[in-house]
């Protein structure tokens, strides 16, 4: 596809650079708009970006474009997720609650990497891992829509 080392470094650099921009942008938007809609949009956009990437013919420009787009979307879920969890459940146990969110994220990361390798070993391609990523992105985008952005009642202690 391209000179591997140079192209890989460029893609990783774009992911890192645009990750900053995406996180700052989503944090700003989370102060102004519905957090569940921001999250839904981000997850659906991830699925779209992955679909575009795997269905276009491979080239260095496509790979760098994917790095830019996916970098922008990569950790942009963190600010609205933190804001939503903090708003709904309050901040008293925010560390524990976000720890649970982050743990589930890490389990998903492990499964994505591991199953990608399993699919490659079984089928000689990562295609099925990409297809599942698209489906899970769509699922994540849709599952956020019914979230009710309302604080849960607090138990008063004396």
Where are these regions (language model features)?
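Small/hydrophobic positions within alpha-helical transmembrane segments
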Residues: 14, 18, 45, 69, ...
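Conserved kink/hinge residues within transmembrane alpha-helices of Major Facilitator Superfamily
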Residues: 23-27, 113, 144
């Amino acid at each position: 596809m391209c000179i591997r080392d140079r192209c890989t470094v460029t893609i990783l650099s774009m992911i890192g650079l645009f990750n900053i921009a995406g996180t700052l942008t989503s944090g700003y938007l989370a102060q102004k708009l519905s957090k569940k809609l921001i999250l839904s949009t981000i997850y659906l956009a991830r699925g779209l970006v992955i679909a575009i990437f795997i269905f276009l013919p491979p080239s260095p420009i496509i790979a760098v474009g994917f790095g830019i787009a996916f970098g922008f979307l990569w950790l942009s879920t963190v600010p609205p997720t933190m804001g939503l969890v903090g708003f709904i459940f309050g901040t008293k146990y925010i560390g524990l609650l976000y720890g649970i969110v982050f743990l589930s994220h890490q389990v998903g990361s492990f499964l994505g990497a591991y199953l990608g390798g399993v699919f490659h070993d079984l089928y000689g391609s990562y295609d099925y891992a990409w297809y599942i990523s698209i489906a899970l992105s769509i699922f994540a985008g849709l599952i956020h829509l019914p979230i009710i952005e309302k604080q849960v009642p607090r138990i008063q202690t004396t």
